[in-house]
């Protein structure tokens, strides 16, 4: 049996410079991006949210307190996506610990274009620059 506790995130990569929040299909891209960011001297902590509601705000806040920076990665459009809710929660619960504005790497604010899926999705090529920019803020 394999179960995932509802409302419990998992730190899947320890790091000290930037927290990267991801879930679902974007977790693997976040892991690739975190590894690539080490070439730029950035040590990422990757948190797999695993469930979005209830969200494990305590795990998110603990990681943001540790790193002072956060990048949220998800496939949905940036506007009204769940990443916006996460950033709002982080601002409410951990604002004083932020050393840089939270960043979101998301889909674009357009309908999902299946023929252009690889251009639409926030793959590591778009995630790494956001991580580096957030780390160097």
Give the location of each predicted region:
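Thiamine diphosphate
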Residues: 1-137
């Amino acid at each position: 049996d394999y179960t995932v506790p509802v409302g419990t995130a998992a730190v899947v990569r320890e790091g000290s410079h930037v927290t990267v929040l991801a879930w679902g299909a974007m977790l693997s891209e976040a892991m690739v991006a975190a590894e690539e960011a080490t070439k730029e001297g950035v040590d990422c902590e990757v948190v797999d949210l695993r469930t979005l509601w209830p969200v494990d705000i305590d795990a998110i806040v603990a990681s943001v307190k540790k790193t002072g920076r956060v990048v949220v990665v998800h496939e949905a459009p940036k506007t009204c996506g769940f990443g916006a809710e996460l950033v709002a929660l982080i601002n409410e619960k951990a604002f004083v610990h932020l050393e840089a504005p939270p960043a979101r790497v998301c889909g674009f604010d357009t309908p999902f274009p299946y023929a252009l899926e690889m251009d639409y999705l926030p793959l590591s090529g778009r995630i790494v620059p956001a991580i580096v920019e957030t780390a160097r803020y």
